[in-house]
Regions:
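Glycine-rich flavin
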Residues: 2-5, 21-174, 202, 207-211, ...
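Beta1/beta-strand and adjacent pyrophosphate-binding region of the FAD-binding site
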Residues: 2-13, 174-184
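Flexible, glycine-rich terminal cap/loop adjacent to redox cofactors
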Residues: 8-19, 24-36, 49, 53-60, ...
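Short hydrophobic core segments
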Residues: 8-10, 116, 136-146, 180-181, ...
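Short glycine/serine/threonine-rich phosphate/pyrophosphate-binding segments
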Residues: 15-22, 162, 187-190, 196, ...
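Glycine-rich dinucleotide-binding loop and its adjacent helix/turn
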Residues: 48, 143-200, 204, 232-233, ...
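A Rossmann-like FAD-binding core segment of flavoenzymes
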Residues: 113, 117-128, 197-300, 371
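FAD-site-proximal beta/loop scaffold in flavoenzymes
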Residues: 158-174, 263-338
Length: 468
């Protein structure tokens, strides 16, 4: 095997493997180091992809139970086979990991299996499962090792009774009662999965609202929707302990306002309180500077404190910890290494919660705009007045567009919709090109589609929607 490269990427998650492919496409001799047996990182193996498989399957099951009969579809003797559902998820993941392997071969990227360390700025040492060390020379190094789940003090994740998101994607039977600690993206998606499949679900959230960082109008409405679906919430509550007794979990928590103590006994506890950068001792001991949050410090070109060593994705303190953000950074770094002008617009990175309905946003929230003392206008349009949503029985939610009062330029968009994750791309593109509400309002949208609600919300900025 050749041991000299132009670029060695450490980590084959969304940021790392995309960076490696783009480097190879730009003519750079590229290798990618990955410690796991499969490529794709957390996202592909135990995150974004398997969770979306279960979200889709569980929603199909819910519709068959609750909605098919109203449509004239009589699904008698409906049965749930969890093992088959999990097998379908695993097959999808395997196919996609094999797809990344194919792309590596297609682009002539050298896949190095093992753990990486950086003894010098031009050397990467790879240690395989048998502890054999091999040195590789390189002109540039890109660190994209992602993140891992965090827990709370005193709560030990065993992936049996007390689980991380990875464990909650692989239950071999449906828990009768599930407690989810954390009301963010991951917690709410997995709460939805297991509620649909039959679990009694309680979400405990430290704050007085769900999905921190989301527009308050959205989080308030979304909470109502999830309550209606049967998910229980304990907001403004602090978990003080979790114990396991005879394969059952006991969760103790206290209300932050009145100090009332409560206890719930359940079959499983999902700890979904966030993620932290995955920076191994082998990487941190290389002399690369970290910030106060233990993330790698980088400049505007994603270069660390050591020249020609770059970092992307969840290990740096730029933008949200999202797979598609890491992908964009991976492409930008590849272009920078190749002598081009790589760039990421952090003001136009969409975020999506893949529940049903979905929640999506891009740009600033109304709360952020108020804090920044920007004069603004708001346009809203409900899906109750959208024809496609009406015939599909998907009328929950609305689109909210916020624009600069003086320029009409779009500052932020938030929405709840059955297809919000797909719809938000239009708004990300609009913001990338500096569009105004009028630009969107004057753009012809196909009828009947959910996306017409975007056009109507843009019209509503000037209080003149057509259908509401």
């Amino acid at each position: 095997m050749d041991s000299n490269f132009d670029v060695i990427v450490i980590g084959a998650g969304p940021g790392g493997y995309v960076c490696a492919i783009k480097c190879a496409q730009l003519g750079l001799k590229t290798a990618c180091v990955e410690s796991s047996k499969t490529l794709g990182g957390t996202c592909l193996n135990v995150g974004c992809i398997p969770s979306k498989s279960l979200l889709n399957s569980s929603e199909m099951y819910r519709k068959a139970q609750k909605e098919f009969n109203n449509l004239g579809i009589e699904a008698n003797n409906l049965k749930l086979n969890l093992a088959k559902m999990m097998n379908n998820k695993n097959k999808s993941v395997l196919a996609l990991t094999k797809g990344v392997e194919f792309l590596f071969k297609k682009n002539k990227i050298t896949h190095l299996r093992g753990k990486a360390s950086i003894p010098t700025k031009s050397t990467v040492t790879v240690t395989d499962d048998l502890k054999k060390k091999t040195n590789f020379k390189t002109k540039n190094i890109v660190i994209g090792t992602g993140s891992v789940p965090t827990s709370l003090p005193g709560i030990k994740i065993d992936e049996k009774t007390i689980v991380s998101s990875a464990g909650a994607l692989s239950f071999d039977k449906i828990p009768k009662e599930l407690v989810v600690i954390g009301g963010g993206y991951i917690g709410l998606e997995l709460s939805s999965v297991w509620k649909r499949l039959g679990s009694k679900v309680t979400v405990i959230e430290f704050l007085d609202h769900i999905i921190p960082g989301m527009d308050k109008d959205i989080s308030t409405e979304f909470l109502k929707i999830l309550n209606k679906q049967g998910i229980n919430f304990k907001l403004n509550s602090k978990v003080t302990g979790v114990s396991v007794v005879k394969n059952k979990a006991v969760v103790d928590f206290t209300n932050n306002k009145n100090a009332t103590r409560e206890r719930i006994q359940c079959d499983k506890v999902l700890v979904a309180v966030g993620r932290k950068s995955n920076i191994s001792a082998d990487i941190s001991s290389s002399g690369i500077k970290l910030d106060s949050q233990n993330k790698i410090q980088v400049n505007e070109k994603f270069e660390t404190s050591i020249k020609n060593i770059f970092a992307i994705g969840d290990v740096i303190n730029k933008g949200p910890m999202l797979a598609h953000k890491a992908e964009d950074e991976g492409i930008a770094v590849a272009e920078i290494i190749a002598g081009q002008a790589g760039h990421v617009n952090y003001d136009a990175i969409p975020a999506v919660i893949y529940t049903s309905p979905e929640v999506a946003m891009v740009g600033k929230t109304e709360e952020q705009i108020i804090k920044e003392k920007i004069k603004y206008k708001v346009g809203k349009f409900p899906f109750l007045a959208n024809s496609r949503a009406k015939v599909n029985s998907e009328t929950e939610g609305f689109v909210k567009i916020i624009v600069d009062e003086k320029t009409d330029r779009v500052l932020g968009v938030s929405m709840i919709s059955a297809v919000a994750g797909t719809m938000i791309a239009e708004l990300a593109l609009a913001m990338e090109f500096g569009a105004s509400a009028e630009d969107i309002a004057r753009t012809c949208h196909a009828h009947p589609t959910h996306s017409e609600a975007i056009k109507e919300a843009a019209m509503a900025v000037d209080k003149k929607p057509i259908h509401f």
